[in-house]
């Protein structure tokens, strides 16, 4: 299995007709610059950068995004007021990721162009409130006026149609593309995602940064520590540094952090991004036609 980097998955997604995103995460600024430059060479279609705002080098990250003329930025894990106006003044479209109506309204007030409302089912870092996508989307739709993108528990055309019936204007899909040939994830982690069933993930570490993980040995260590009424420092000491890299990119399925969504129970294979996109769109169209033919 050939391992490709983050930019390959983003450019493959854009080339397949959807918006590919480069996840800046805890990436060093100059590494992000390299990914952006190579992504631009790999596709002439739009792509964006996803920027969690909790990292200390956020100023350098944003400067590079502007210097490299990225046109779309998804922000998360921070106050949207901090960067939205500055980015929009540079001609950049800003989308903010939220897990509740409260933060959706704050993002709209901050002037973002669209909102991603992400339900509790989503993999990786999430909100502390256990609000499902099924509940969150219509609640947010009822009170915001800007475009709404659904996320969390979406890996099929059926789920895409369902969220759009609930009021979403589009969808953001993460977990399904982890199990793609272009994904930078380690093959051992990809295989663990394919193997995972419903109930094999759980949201934990809510006192730090809530995260949905596959229940492996590291997850079990966290649960054992919770039985001892740990302090925040106890949890930080157990988590350590680079735990996610160890699990998802180095392939340590025992001690690593394995971030994936509940929808892993519907991920059965590893295939090219273009095939995944085609499957989702084909199923979406088929499901839409079936729904139109229903007799109630």
What name fits each language-model region?
Residues 2-6:
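Short, small-residue-biased leader/transition segments that mark boundaries at the very start
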Residues 24-26, 51-55, 79:
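Short glycine-rich, polar/acidic loop-and-turn segments at beta strand-coil junctions
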Residues 127-149, 155-296:
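Conserved active-site-proximal phosphate/metal-binding subdomains
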